[in-house]
């Protein structure tokens, strides 16, 4: 039986000169040891976290030699560079950390793995993993249901699966964002949804058209809207708007102003009622501990 990573995805933000690497680890809940060691060892890594068995690394583009020391700094990412629309990632590690570098070979979305040094035992292992260059697109969706039927989170999840099935990219995340419970226009729980995708550059601007078509066909509401953000990290102003939308009623003009300031594309599907929730969802798409909370339970 072979033990391999399930997938490796690299999303590039050309404006920031950063890459977000998402790896699906072979173990059921991933490896917090890998997160800790990689971040401790690698000067290129700006942040790292784990969501289940998915490891996320935000890295600079460049090369930094690793000072590998058993137990203390055992494994990491030595180099990240882009060439011909491919992302090259060089991993290095001692003992098991080095063996892990080789296990990306059978992963989905990996084009090629070059073993630079064969690891195992107490030896250094080093491997170059090559993936297609991808980009992150976050979609906010709100107001697809009625008081009688439907659920926005379910429809959004179905759409995420359809995007992946269509081959436009990878469905990375589904975030339920709690909004202001006192909203008189809510159907019930007053939540909106953010979907995160890794997409191939040639499909970057086709994704919203595909999702718009599905929403048009499947939404039950007359006020459905979506919002689209291109980039790894929603801005501080987007986050603050989302937090405000948890606390109180906000005007649609404010949502449109935030969208204009952050190059967010607003797409009304059946109306404009869902615009506020769709834009707000984008601001907390990357803040999973804040997204589900009521305003009174958030300490900033």
UniProtKB/Swiss-Prot annotation:
InterPro entries: Methan_mark_11, TiaS-like_TCKD. Disulfide bonds: none annotated. Pfam families: TiaS_TCKD. Coiled coil: none annotated. This is Uncharacterized protein MJ0921. It comes from Methanocaldococcus jannaschii (strain ATCC 43067 / DSM 2661 / JAL-1 / JCM 10045 / NBRC 100440).
């Amino acid at each position: 039986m072979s033990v391999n990573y399930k997938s490796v995805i690299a999303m590039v933000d050309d404006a920031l000169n950063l890459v977000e690497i998402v790896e699906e680890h072979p173990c059921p809940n991933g490896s917090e040891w890998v997160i800790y060691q990689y971040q401790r060892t690698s000067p290129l890594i700006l942040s790292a976290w784990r969501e289940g068995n998915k490891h996320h690394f935000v890295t600079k583009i460049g090369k930094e030699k690793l000072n590998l020391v058993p137990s203390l700094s055992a494994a990491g990412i030595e180099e990240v560079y882009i060439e011909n629309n491919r992302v090259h990632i060089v991993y290095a590690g001692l003992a098991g950390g080095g063996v892990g570098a080789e296990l990306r070979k059978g992963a989905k979305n990996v084009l090629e793995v070059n073993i630079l040094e064969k690891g195992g035992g107490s030896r250094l292992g080093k491997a170059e993993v090559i993936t297609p260059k991808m980009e992150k697109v976050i979609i906010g969706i709100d107001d697809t249901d009625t008081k009688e039927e439907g659920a926005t989170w379910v429809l959004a999840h179905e759409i995420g699966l359809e995007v992946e099935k269509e081959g436009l990219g990878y469905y990375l995340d589904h975030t339920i964002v709690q909004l202001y419970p006192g909203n008189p226009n809510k159907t019930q729980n007053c939540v909106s949804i953010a979907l995160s995708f890794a997409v191939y550059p040639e499909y970057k601007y086709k994704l919203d058209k595909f999702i718009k078509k599905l929403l048009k066909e499947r939404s039950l509401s007359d006020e459905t809207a979506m919002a689209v953000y291109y980039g790894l990290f929603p801005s501080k102003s987007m986050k603050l708007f989302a937090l405000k939308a948890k606390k109180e009623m906000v005007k649609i003009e404010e949502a449109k102003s935030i969208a204009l300031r952050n190059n967010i594309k607003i797409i009304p599907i059946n109306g404009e009622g869902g615009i506020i929730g769709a834009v707000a969802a984008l601001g907390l798409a990357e803040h999973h501990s804040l997204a589900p909370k009521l305003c009174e339970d958030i300490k900033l």
